[in-house]
Design a protein with these regions (language model features):
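Hydrophobic/aromatic beta-strand patches that form the interior of the parallel beta-sheet core
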Residues: 4, 60, 85, 118, ...
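Short, acidic Gly/Pro/Ser/Thr-rich loop/turn segments
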Residues: 10-13, 41, 93, 138-142
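Beta-strand-turn-beta hairpins that frame and shape the catalytic cleft
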Residues: 1, 27-31, 124-132
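Conserved beta-strand hairpin/beta-sheet module of binuclear metal-dependent hydrolase folds
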Residues: 2-49, 157-166
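Hydrophobic alpha-helical segments and helix pairs
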Residues: 69, 74-77, 81-121
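Short acidic low-complexity segments
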Residues: 52-55, 118-126
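Active-site-proximal loop/helix segment associated with metal-binding centers of metalloenzymes
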Residues: 98-102, 122-166
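Active-site metal-binding motif and surrounding structural segment of the metallo-beta-lactamase
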Residues: 41-86
């Protein structure tokens, strides 16, 4: 198995740092991306690392914030085969509170109509190598940094979040 960080908040090499996350993972059966980061940074850094994102067959979006899935639209344009696994609630509106303002940080909900996007509602087994699981309660893994994050119902409960087990 190989895991390469393509997008992260910090960097110690020639890759561009960006608020967000994208991991390129190779298993025996898959070339996948766990998250896509917020923008074109994932494509630029993949090119620097010699990774052909056209070869990616699976994408897992951890949750519905643009720092983890903002590059989804561009990825769908540049890769014509990967299946994208995402919790259905990830496409609901999400916000970050900045002073008195609620700044949208959600994903483009129009993308959920794409036939390659697989909308999930809870745990899901992709195959014997890849399993997705959710956490029922925000309290189990909450960070104080999340206290400024909201959805249309109030404080973000992260019911749109999923994790990848390899």
């Amino acid at each position: 198995m190989k895991i390469i960080v393509l997008v992260e908040n910090t960097t110690t090499c020639d890759l561009e740092a960006m608020h967000g996350l994208s991991l390129y993972i190779e298993t025996k059966k898959h070339k996948l991306l766990f998250d896509l980061g917020p923008d074109q940074t994932v494509f630029e850094n993949a090119k620097k690392k010699g990774i052909d994102l056209q070869e990616v067959d699976t994408v897992v979006i951890s949750h519905g914030h643009n720092d983890h899935g903002g590059a989804l639209e561009q990825f769908l344009e540049e890769n014509d085969k990967a299946k994208i696994y995402i919790q259905e609630r990830a496409f609901e509106p999400h916000f970050s509170k900045s002073g008195e303002d609620m700044v949208p940080i959600g994903l483009n909900s129009d993308l959920k109509e794409n036939p390659r996007i697989i909308l999930l509602n809870g745990d899901f087994v992709i195959d014997e190598e890849l399993q997705l699981f959710t956490v029922e309660s925000r309290e189990k893994c909450n960070s104080e940094a999340n206290d400024v994050l909201y959805n249309v119902h109030g404080l973000d409960d992260f019911a749109h979040e999923q994790n990848l087990r390899l």
